[in-house]
């Protein structure tokens, strides 16, 4: 059993007799000398989809839930449901738009490297690759010779994501975006 300080974003844990998927973790360090470091976790109940915020002391022991990862690709949208197809056995996995709203900013039909997390036979979350290639649909005109400066400008991708890009990048270009930091990495 790992300690709360060892739990990472994207883990499936057992808490109060239920299985939760950890979406966010923030570390709270009290200013007093005797205060213990707390880890605040935003979690989603796998069975109901309800949100829960819990705080754990750094040395609290937490049970990890059994889960598996399956390689998948985005297939199609059916109303409010997004359908992903297993890359090996073509099993469809449905997700409600609200459950994967943040991940949708990085997913296009060409996105490779998606992983579906499965707990008790049910899909609970999508794990993004570390970087994705997205096309810019709206940004200020590129400035010739701007490659020497480190200035940036906002650019909107086809998915609706807005990131800061160097001034020499133009509309229609494909760029590589870091999915954890939401930052421009390079041209694709």
From Swiss-Prot:
Entry's Gene Ontology molecular function annotations: translation elongation factor activity
GO biological process: peptide biosynthetic process
Lineage top rank: taxon: Bacteria
InterPro entries: Elong-fact-P_C, NA-bd_OB-fold, Rib_uL2_dom2, Transl_elong_fac_P/YeiP, Transl_elong_KOW-like, Transl_elong_p-like_YeiP, Transl_elong_P/YeiP_cen, Transl_elong_P/YeiP_CS
GO cellular component, one term: cytoplasm
Homology family: Belongs to the elongation factor P family.
HAMAP family reported for this sequence: EFP
Protein name stated in the entry: Elongation factor P-like protein
Record lineage: Bacteria, Pseudomonadati, Pseudomonadota, Gammaproteobacteria, Vibrionales
